[in-house]
Amino acid sequence: MLTTPWQEGAPSGVFEQWVVALEFQPAWSQGKCDEAVAQQLSGSFAATHLSVHGLWPNFEPAQHGGRHWPQYCVVAGSGGDNYTSCDPATGGRANGTICEIEPATWAAFNGTSSGTWPTHNPEYAFGDLAAHEWAKHGSCSGLTQEPYFALVEARALPLVSGTGGALVTSRVGGNASHAELAAAFGADVSGKKVSFSCSDECALSDVWFALDRATLAPIDCADPDSCVDKCAGGIHIIDWDKDGCH
């Protein structure tokens, strides 16, 4: 009997699907006004647009004993890195070298005026989400760090600027129905099913898409949708400059 839906310490590079995760930063930063990310939000791109959360290797459960995703993976070969040492649940970042963002990666994505993280990934630029995403998910991708984050952006940024993202921006401070969001985001992925995550107050926090690993073609997202049943009255898009930290 499975005790968790994930496989800790799975072999890196063994999976069948990707999940592209976008987040709405105002929902993540509410109640965290002392954090650097929240202090950067007012008037920013992320205050009114979706941000990049991550790109997650996912299993076809039938091929992995019912498990849904790998995490904190182990790289094959002599001397291969074991990212289970990075899991906060088991001590967290015991091996700082492999668990953190490399200087070259910071330079490529965050350290120059052309870096994309301050605009599109504020939790990466001003928080510790980049290190978390690399250790938990990137370690399972079969890629090294810079190519992994380049793929994250290649898959996620077109969705940020797509039909669904435009709908979110247009409804800041108001509501959108689940059907409206599903149709708008579905139009960006050939009509495939998209999943959403909402707070207990029905504020939109995440949007998840699924891709076939081999072809990168959109497929139906099997991740649970926490908005569809509880938010029949509408899904709220938080206006940070009105309802955020002041």
Question: Where do the model's predicted regions map?
Answer:
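N-terminal module-boundary/linker segments of secreted carbohydrate-active enzymes
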Residues: 1-42, 46
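Domain-level detector of nuclease and nuclease-like folds
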Residues: 36-246
